[in-house]
Curated annotation (Swiss-Prot):
Gene3D superfamilies: Helix hairpin bin (1.10.287.690), Palm domain of DNA polymerase (3.90.1600.10), Ribonuclease H-like superfamily/Ribonuclease H (3.30.420.10). Keywords: DNA replication, DNA-binding, DNA-directed DNA polymerase, Mitochondrion, Nucleotidyltransferase, Plasmid, Transferase. This is Probable DNA polymerase. SMART domains: POLBc (SM00486). It is found in: Mitochondrion. The lineage of its organism: Eukaryota, Fungi, Dikarya, Ascomycota, Pezizomycotina. PROSITE patterns: DNA_POLYMERASE_B.
């Protein structure tokens, strides 16, 4: 159940801008947070005993804890693991097993909290298994909270310590394979080399490079074993013995002496390994203050010493660059090789109803199954009806209709394949051939299906794609945008879900209330009456109308895709069907038409993970909960504005460490803060009315972005630091990464913005240009960590688990298993990503919004990424609906109420002069009366809302419907 306390949280955090000392007890800053970890051994004398059931048709099983833990601690896992081992020994003879830990939260969501481990019943191995499954998550609460879907919508966490509530599940499979070994059986005694050091006789030998100690002075008389030669023009330091394991080696220095600098060649056992250049930075007599440049493999590292202490360090980060696309795509528009597919489902009640802990939360009352599948190839449409009891077999037969030689290489599009249709389809396809999903963040972006035909060994391929990922709007809207000849129909879905009505129903047209958009402007009573008049003779046929509706969907989607494909190709010479998402398509267009070579660095995972700490979303804050005559303004294309008018990070990154003064001094910068990203200690001015610099907080519901007062440490973009300095923020610089500055998006944005500005709002190009403009920036910030997905047999799955690390497994209802294995870093080094670009664009956007936040501080009620609500007219020079970055006036609320970010509403006049209500409530899809929202302003008032939500379950190839309760306090 979602809880939202406006008075206890929002007023304190958003309006009073709590300092660190006054923050609620459950909120801790990342760098200050600490937790007392539970002891390794449980103090419990009684081991819990859950129960074991088969997980699927495979040999995998699930152990379910009987106890619901509040909270789940390390001891909880220890106790349940003991109970599991005890039960396992009674039921299975195999000593070893594959093992994965999960949590079933109180909303019935299930999340894996470990990868697949290989365990055994040996007592020591059990303790090691416990360490493996709890070390990551019990020590960092955010790890668990981030594994929870929509954590803010459910009361999953105990507010006291941030640990989750719920039951424990162990998914496991016994194995007697002698080649399967636990992680600890693989370990052998490894000889450890001692650190490589020079003799410690000289107290100045403090500086180390790659384990080699080098004197941190230009006073050569302090170097070990020094000898001057060639009348003092050169010096040598020979045969300095160092130790490495049992063997001794010698380190030597050959030095060329100049008036202002020394050049040094370093040799290990008489083999040159790197070069040094020491340069004086103070007076000629000051030999303890100097700049040292070490060159190895054509890479330089710079160290600066003052009075013998290192005060600055820098080095270039090895990097490649994002490359242009040079290939030419060819499309035969007479045969674009596209198939469209649509499923219709029917929900049936579950008896007994699956309920949450309190009888309400997470309540699951029905399950969906496919009842119809329609397929369209551009010429013909076929439909297949399914029965509830045999839909899997019937769907297999339906798919055989497109498993044909002539469809080899075709793209099969379904609108919402990733989150809905694919749940039913994936396991079915795995029974017919080889299935290779491409997934990111749990979302199926593309599915490759290889199959063979009878009496043939040749493999054929179909690619299943999600059209919603490339055209993210309803099919109804898309049909209008692209001026389809065939438009989406209306259908009474609620009537279909009434299980008292047979599928062969023929009779009166279903009532208006059964249609999903009833009582809205999208489907008026007049439109319904026009539809119902077609069936005056009570000849409305459920089966016939369902088939017609589904077939029209496939035809409408096909027409949209072909139109989109043609328009993109004619403008950019790119085949859009090669790209699974709209960001990937926008990125391809940019790389093909506008990218300059050797400009944008391809940032790998280690540096990505650091700079990503500076990547925040927009400012979203509530300041005043109620007002009258409140005007709403939105920035015209905020992110494209930032991309066009501001410099972006480019070139080779340079790591720097030191104070800001030394960073400026030793990089020869003319900037107050050199361009790049910095790890800094932040101190806010305590009198700042509306803070705007973000940071991340660990809360019981996971990591959250906040804009507080106080002190903390974090990574930020240089331009955001400069903007904050103007308003009194203070920064202590620790380290950073410097970049060159480049303009790179001007032409891309100019082209698309001009298209948008000159196109009618309901035209295809208005929609396309807006989509491409706003979709590019996020593509640069993709997570570089990849995963490889396998859907295979149990036997092959066991082999994969035994040979790969970081594996998770999902047994499927067919008996096959879905395995996800994290790819090693070197396997995804060419993903063409550059998170500095995304971070900079987001920062520039916050800087732009901070201008309005500070200028209209006394008048602002609410800010949300690219929009504000104020009780004053903005200056005229700041408002222009046609110019990038300017504000555009939306409407005025006669009366306005907000309960928090993404939760607001009010009364306003429409274009016809009629007073209407507008309410926006994150996470709630139904219509909420404004008066209900307004009741949330009353202290101690409780507002409870209920709506149905899908719960996808890939392991069962189904989707559940559950009642979700949102509670506003």
């Amino acid at each position: 159940m979602s809880k939202f306390s406006f008075f206890n949280y929002r007023i304190n955090m958003r309006n009073s801008h709590a300092t660190l000392g006054s923050l609620p007890c459950f909120i801790k800053f990342n760098y200050l947070s600490s937790s007392s970890h539970s002891k390794f051994y449980s103090t419990s004398t009684d081991s819990p005993m859950g129960h074991i059931v088969s997980a699927s048709k495979s040999s995998w099983y699930n152990y379910y804890s009987h106890k619901n833990y509040d909270p789940l601690t390390r001891e909880s896992f220890h106790d349940e693991l003991r109970g599991f081992i005890s039960l396992y020994k009674k039921q299975f003879k195999e000593e070893k097993f594959f093992f994965m830990a999960k949590i079933k939260f109180n909303n019935n969501d299930i999340r894996s909290i470990s990868t697949v481990q290989i365990g055994s019943t040996d007592p020591l191995e059990v303790l090691r298994l416990l360490e493996a499954i709890t070390s990551t998550y019990m020590h960092t609460h955010t790890g668990i909270s981030e594994a929870v879907s929509e954590p803010f919508e459910y009361e999953l966490f105990s507010l006291g310590d941030g640990l989750p509530k719920g039951n424990i599940i162990f998914t496991f499979k016994p194995t007697s394979n002698p080649s399967i070994k636990t992680k600890y059986e693989h370990k052998s005694n490894i000889k450890r080399n001692k650190n490589i050091n020079l003799s410690k006789k000289n107290p100045l030998n403090k500086f180390k490079y790659n384990g080699y100690t080098i004197p941190n002075t230009m006073d050569l008389s302090q170097w070990p074993n020094i000898h001057f030669i060639n009348d003092g023009k050169n010096a040598v330091s020979l045969n300095n013995i160092i130790k490495s394991g049992v063997d001794n080696m010698t380190l030597s220095f050959f030095i060329t002496i100049n008036k202002k600098y020394n050049e040094i060649t370093v040799l290990l056992n008489n083999t040159p390994i790197f070069k040094i250049k020491d340069e004086k930075i103070m007076s000629e007599d000051d030999l303890s203050s100097f700049k040292r440049t070490i060159t190895e493999n054509e890479q330089d590292k710079v160290y600066v010493f003052e009075n013998g202490e290192m005060v600055f360090f820098s080095e270039n980060v090895k990097t490649s660059f994002i490359k242009k696309i040079t290939r030419q795509d060819l499309i035969n528009f007479e045969n674009p090789k596209i198939i469209t597919l649509d499923l219709e489902t029917r929900s049936v009640p579950i008896h007994p109803i699956k309920e949450g802990k309190d009888g309400k939360e997470g309540k699951v009352d029905s399950i969906m199954f496919p009842i119809l599948m329609s397929v369209y190839n551009g010429k013909f449409v076929k439909s297949f009806l399914f029965s509830q009891s045999a839909w899997e077999t019937e769907m297999m037969n339906a798919f055989k209709s497109i498993m044909l030689r002539k469809y080899d290489g075709y793209k099969v599009y379904t609108h919402n394949f990733s989150y809905f249709d694919g749940i039913f389809i994936i396991d079915i396809l795995s029974r017919l051939g080889e299935v290779k999903p491409f997934m990111r963040n749990g979302k199926i972006l593309k599915l490759t299906f290889n199959f063979t035909l009878p009496n043939s060994k040749r493999k054929y391929t179909l690619y299943f794609m999600d059209s919603l990922l490339i055209l993210p709007d309803s099919l109804d809207k898309l049909s209008n945008f692209f001026n389809n000849k065939v438009k989406k129909l209306f259908f009474p879905h609620s009537f279909l879900d009434d299980n008292t009505i047979p599928i062969n129903y023929v009779g009166k047209c279903p009532d208006y209330k059964y249609f999903p958009k009833a009582y809205t402007e999208d489907f008026t009573i007049e439109q319904y009456q026009e539809y119902a008049n077609k069936f005056k003779n009570n000849n409305w046929d459920l089966k016939k109308e369902l088939i017609k509706y589904c077939e029209i969907d496939t035809i409408a989607l096909y027409q949209v895709l072909v139109s989109f494909q043609r328009k993109i190709y004619e403008k950019f010479m790119i085949d859009c069907t090669k790209y699974p998402t709209i960001p990937s398509l926008a990125f391809a267009i940019f790389r093909k038409k506008y990218l300059v070579e050797d400009m944008i660095p391809n940032i790998k995972s280690k540096l990505h993970n650091i700079i990503k700490l500076s990547y925040f979303g927009g400012i979203c804050e509530l300041y005043k909960p109620f007002g009258v005559n409140i005007k709403s303004y939105d920035v015209n294309s905020l992110y494209p504005f930032a991309m066009k008018y501001f410099k972006m990070p480019s070139g080779i990154p340079k790591y720097v460490k030191g104070t800001l003064q030394n960073i400026v001094r030793f990089t020869d910068s003319i900037c107050e803060v050199p361009f790049g990203f910095y790890n800094v200690k932040v101190k806010t001015p305590l009198n700042l009315d509306k803070p705007f610099l973000p940071t991340r907080l660990n809360t019981p519901a996971g990591t959250r972005t906040a804009f507080p007062l106080g002190q903390w440490e974090g990574w930020y973009f240089s331009e955001e630091i400069l903007n904050a300095m103007k308003h009194g923020y203070e920064f202590e610089f620790i380290e950073g990464y410097l970049f060159e500055e480049s303009s790179m998006f001007d032409e891309y944005i100019d082209l698309l913005y001009n298209i948008k500005k000159n196109s009618p709002k309901e035209s295809p190009w208005y929609y396309i240009s807006k989509l491409l403009m706003n979709s590019l920036y996020g593509r640069f910030g993709l997570n570089p960590e990849g995963e490889e997905i396998f859907i295979t047999s149990e036997e092959e799955g066991d082999a994969i688990i035994a040979t790969k690390e970081y594996v998770t497994i999902t047994p499927l209802s067919s008996g096959n298993v879905l395995i996800s294995a994290k790819l090693p870093e070197e396997a995804f080094g060419d993903m063409n990503i550059s998170v500095p670009i995304s971070s900079a664009i987001a920062a520039y956007s916050r800087i732009h919004m901070s201008h309005f936040l500070t200028k209209y501080s006394n008048n602002i009620y609410y800010i949300d990424t690219d929009g504000i609500k104020v009780d004053i007219d903005l200056d005229k020079d700041e408002v222009d609906s046609k110019e990038l970055g300017k504000m555009k006036y939306e409407y005025v609320f006669e009366e306005y109420t907000s309960l928090g970010p993404k939760v607001y509403g009010g009364l306003l006049y429409d274009k016809k002069g009629k007073l209407i209500e507008l309410v926006k409530l994150r996470g709630y899809s139904s219509k909420l009366p404004y008066n209900k929202l307004k009741e949330g302003l009353v202290k101690d008032h409780t507002l409870e809302l209920t709506q149905k939500k899908w719960k996808r379950k890939l392991s069962e190839s189904t989707v559940y419907l559950k009642n979700t309760h949102l509670l506003f306090l």
